[in-house]
Swiss-Prot record:
Protein name: Low density lipoprotein receptor adapter protein 1
Start and end residues of each PID domain: 44-168
GO annotation, biological process: amyloid precursor protein metabolic process; cellular response to cytokine stimulus; cholesterol homeostasis; cholesterol metabolic process; low-density lipoprotein particle clearance; positive regulation of low-density lipoprotein particle clearance; positive regulation of receptor-mediated endocytosis; positive regulation of receptor-mediated endocytosis involved in cholesterol transport
Renumbered ranges of motif [DE]-X(1,2)-F-X-X-[FL]-X-X-X-R motif: 255-264
Residues annotated with N-acetylmethionine modification: 1
Function: Adapter protein (clathrin-associated sorting protein (CLASP)) required for efficient endocytosis of the LDL receptor (LDLR) in polarized cells such as hepatocytes and lymphocytes, but not in non-polarized cells (fibroblasts). May be required for LDL binding and internalization but not for receptor clustering in coated pits. May facilitate the endocytosis of LDLR and LDLR-LDL complexes from coated pits by stabilizing the interaction between the receptor and the structural components of the pits. May also be involved in the internalization of other LDLR family members.
Gene designation: Ldlrap1
Protein's organism: Rattus norvegicus (Rat)
UniProt free text on domains: The [DE]-X(1,2)-F-X-X-[FL]-X-X-X-R motif mediates interaction the AP-2 complex subunit AP2B1. The PID domain mediates interaction with the NPXY internalization motif of LDLR.
UniProt subcellular location: Cytoplasm
Length: 306
């Protein structure tokens, strides 16, 4: 089956997804049909890109908005005269982890719930996403230079797929919170939960045998664990009495996600700049195609004169 077929469709379903093991330690070798392997997305998809930069935007989504933002970012990168930073982009339902490819230093960790839009600028072979800042409510557009158009498409579809899974986790967390609040009001316990083991009522959680706590403690990249103070740790693991693992979702992140959801065409799906034709094209690709040169034969840095 084509490698990106499931990414272009309705993606992975829950709650069966929550029963899959999350091997949070090492990144496994990418299978040929990676989108048909649920554990691969849960573990995290890794892409090698070049970071163009960031600019602020006024709205959480929009094709023209993102195109203009990317144009500003590219112009700034060209004017700087510096070589682009090689980065590793890891995408999972938890979010995007950005690290320096040379030093393995953590650059940024963005929760998937803060991302409002992503797109692939086909002519420029650029992947870009818009996310709400962790420090304030400003919206940032980050752009990355890909080796070819098909990679930009693959990253875009992967982020959209991860968002779909994360949204389902969020729905579970909301339902779990409502059950606990109702049980608290009635003075009773919800079957299958232990009130002395759960977070406070101000915290939303998603439960299920999602991942092994010991594995989660192992950073996916060696330096990520050393830089956890710089990471957005709004999602934290907790263990219930039935050995299920909990995703905590603090009120600030919950509010940000709810607000961004209102701006989406479909609250359950991350808006992308891909057309049906783009998605169909991406569905015909496999990871082995990413290493093949484009028919144009131009090196990407030559196109941008970097």
């Amino acid at each position: 089956m084509d490698a990106l077929k499931s990414a272009g469709r309705a993606l992975i379903r829950s709650p069966s997804l929550a029963k899959q093991s999350w091997a949070g330690g090492r990144h496994r070798k990418l299978p040929e049909n990676w989108t048909d392997t649920r554990e691969t997305l849960l573990e995290g998809m890794v892409f090698s890109l070049k970071y163009l930069g960031m600019t602020l935007v006024e709205r959480p989504k929009g094709e023209e908005l993102s195109a203009a933002a990317v144009k500003r970012i590219v112009a700034t990168a060209k004017a700087s005269g510096k070589k682009l930073q090689k980065v590793t982009l890891k995408v999972s339902p938890r979010g995007i982890i950005l690290t320096d490819s040379l030093t393995s230093q953590l650059i940024e960790n963005v929760s998937i719930y803060r991302i409002s839009y992503c797109t692939a600028q086909m002519h420029d072979k650029v992947f870009a996403y818009i996310a709400q800042s962790q420090q304030n409510e400003s919206l940032e557009c980050h752009a990355f230079l890909c080796t070819k158009r098909k990679v930009a498409q693959a990253v875009t579809l992967t982020v959209a797929q991860a968002f779909k899974v994360a949204f389902e986790f969020w729905q579970v967390s909301k339902e779990e919170k409502e059950k606990r609040e109702k049980a608290n009001q009635e003075g009773g316990d919800v079957p299958g939960t232990r009130r002395d083991s759960t977070p406070s009522l101000k915290t939303s959680v998603a439960t299920g045998n999602l991942l092994d706590l010991e594995e989660l403690a192992k950073a996916p990249l060696s330096t990520v664990s050393a830089n956890t103070k710089n990471m957005d740790d709004a999602l934290r693991p907790q263990v219930l009495g039935n050995n299920s693992v909990v995703w905590e979702l603090d009120d600030g992140l919950d509010e940000a996600f709810s607000r961004l959801a209102q701006s989406r065409t479909n609250p359950q799906v991350l808006d992308t700049g891909l057309t049906a034709q783009d998605i169909h094209y991406a569905q015909c690709l496999s990871p082995t195609d990413w290493d093949k040169p484009d028919s144009s034969g131009f090196d990407q840095d030559d196109v941008f004169s970097f």
